[in-house]
């Protein structure tokens, strides 16, 4: 097999022996490809996990154009810090909480998504004030170290007032819980976040640079050609 499928990485050669249907199914599944830019972003995120609590916690904007892998990076970060059940306390620890932004940046929709990510199901009868209190309580209880908000672009669908209220909510949570917040989105969303001077001071930025014809792109293509279970080498 090593000679027959020498164009593939050794760990992936067995998949070339699968049926066509099984190989198509394999190709459709998500998988992580370790590339320098993505690994550099993960290093920035890892620094936030171990950051000690203080009055003004550092936060991060992970931004780039559509298709640059923002969601894949924050999903990978979340999986590397998956929830762990503590037998002694009977509680799950969730060091990294990944939340997708709701379609509109209203407080009730935001806290609904946040509490849903915290596995809270009884939400229909809760007021915004109650949801805020419950979110603060649960985030502290599960010992969340970093809160990640993906697709922060959806904030732009709100009115100027809704956007200001949402930015105030971010600032409130990071101040109250003393945890970093990561926002992933486009350049436009980054500029919107930075309109709040209080947030601009604490949000660092990591830009995912667009692909160009350089070593990084060739490395990406080489990775694909080595792991895709094609029985013949690409030319």
Model-derived segments and their meaning:
Residues 1-58:
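A short, basic N-terminal segment
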Residues 4-19, 23, 42, 106-113, ...:
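Mid-core helix/loop region of P-loop NTP-binding domains shared across ATPases and GTPases
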Residues 54-76:
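Walker A/P-loop nucleotide-binding motif
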Residues 79-90, 120-122:
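Post-Walker A helix-loop "phosphate-sensing" segment adjacent to the P-loop in P-loop NTPases
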Residues 84-102:
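Conserved catalytic segments around the Walker B and adjacent sensor/switch elements
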Residues 151, 183-189:
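A short beta-strand-to-loop transition that corresponds to the Sensor-1 phosphate-sensing loop
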Residues 194-210:
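A short helix-turn-beta junction within AAA+ P-loop NTPase domains corresponding to the substrate/partner-engaging
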Residues 209-235:
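Conserved small helical "lid"/interfacial subdomain of P-loop NTPases
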């Amino acid at each position: 097999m090593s000679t027959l499928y020498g164009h593939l990485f050794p760990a992936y050669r067995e998949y070339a022996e699968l049926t066509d249907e099984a190989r198509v199914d394999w190709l459709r599944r998500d998988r992580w490809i370790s590339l320098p830019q993505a690994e550099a972003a993960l290093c920035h995120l890892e620094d936030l996990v171990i950051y000690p609590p203080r009055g003004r916690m550092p936060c991060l904007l992970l931004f780039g154009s559509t298709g640059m892998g923002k969601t894949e990076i924050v999903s990978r970060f979340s999986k590397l810090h998956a929830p762990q059940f503590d037998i002694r306390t009977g509680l799950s620890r969730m060091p990294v909480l990944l939340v997708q932004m709701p379609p509109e940046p209203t407080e009730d929709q935001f806290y609904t998504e946040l509490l849903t990510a915290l596995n809270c199901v009884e939400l229909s009868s809760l007021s915004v004030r109650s949801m805020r209190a419950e979110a603060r309580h649960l985030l502290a209880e599960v010992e969340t170290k970093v809160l990640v908000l993906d697709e922060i672009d959806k904030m732009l669908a709100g009115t100027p007032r809704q956007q200001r209220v949402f930015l105030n909510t971010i600032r409130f949570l990071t101040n109250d819980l003393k945890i970093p917040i990561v926002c992933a989105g486009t350049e436009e969303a980054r500029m919107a976040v930075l309109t709040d001077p209080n947030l601009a001071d604490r949000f660092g930025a990591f830009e995912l640079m667009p692909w160009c014809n350089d070593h990084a792109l060739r490395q990406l293509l080489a990775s694909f050609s080595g792991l895709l279970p094609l029985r013949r080498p690409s030319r």
